């Protein structure tokens, strides 16, 4: 079920404050965050966020196409090594 329109997108307040501070100083640096649940809004376009994946911070450059998605969608938490190889087929 989608979030109600009258509530608006979910954002952690500290994340908006960090972007405002960078905007005033007109700097473009990495914004580290553990808030994977925050929705990307238009004000975030052009900034690079370091989204924590449980082990390290993954740099995510926000583009116009990402607006409306969550930050966590762009920092995968699991490493995929492929499916197991059949040992019988490998011997041949």
Curated annotation (Swiss-Prot):
The gene is rpsS. InterPro entries: Ribosomal_uS19, Ribosomal_uS19_bac-type, Ribosomal_uS19_CS, Ribosomal_uS19_SF. GO terms for molecular function: rRNA binding; structural constituent of ribosome. Belongs to the universal ribosomal protein uS19 family. Protein S19 forms a complex with S13 that binds strongly to the 16S ribosomal RNA. The keyword rRNA-binding applies. It comes from Magnetococcus marinus (strain ATCC BAA-1437 / JCM 17883 / MC-1). It holds the Pfam family Ribosomal_S19. One of its GO terms (cellular component) is small ribosomal subunit. This is Small ribosomal subunit protein uS19. Keywords: Ribonucleoprotein, Ribosomal protein, RNA-binding, rRNA-binding. GO terms for biological process: ribosomal small subunit assembly; translation.
